[in-house]
Amino acid sequence: MTLYVDSSALIKRYVAEDDSEDADAILLGDTEWVTGRHTFVEVHLAIHRRLGETERRVATTAFERDWQRTFVVALDDVVCRRAAELGIVTGARSLDALHLAAAERAGGRSVPIVTFDVRLGQAGRSLGFVVIGS
């Protein structure tokens, strides 16, 4: 099974938060992850902002390892235009709209979205996605 994984779900693997164990259970039970290119930036910045130097190195190494096994959707013109449309329709914020468009590109409504972001989850459900986590 393929899962679209947003930054809020991935971050929980490297930074101890509420639902970190749930995120691991969901993600480690699956063999294929897909996400948008912008997730790389979101996760790296979250690690940098929230962890000390030693923890940051460990988390960054773990994230880089996970990133190698993740299929990445390019944020090309088509995806960006679709994100703008989806943002208008759902009221989603910019990065959330990019996640929705990338998930759509990754396989449409047949690919569940794993997120712990309530607003992204609501927007995804309103578009007919199965949302896991929030």
Per-region residue spans from a language model:
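Short, well-structured N-terminal submotif of metal-dependent ribonuclease cores
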Residues: M1-T35, R50-T61, G128-F129
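Histidine- and aromatic-rich ligand-binding microenvironments
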Residues: V5-D6, T35-G36, A92-D96, T115-D117, ...
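A generic structural signal for short hydrophobic patches within well-formed alpha-helices
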Residues: L10-I11, F40, L120-G121
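Active-site-proximal, substrate-binding regions of enzyme catalytic domains
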Residues: E42-F71
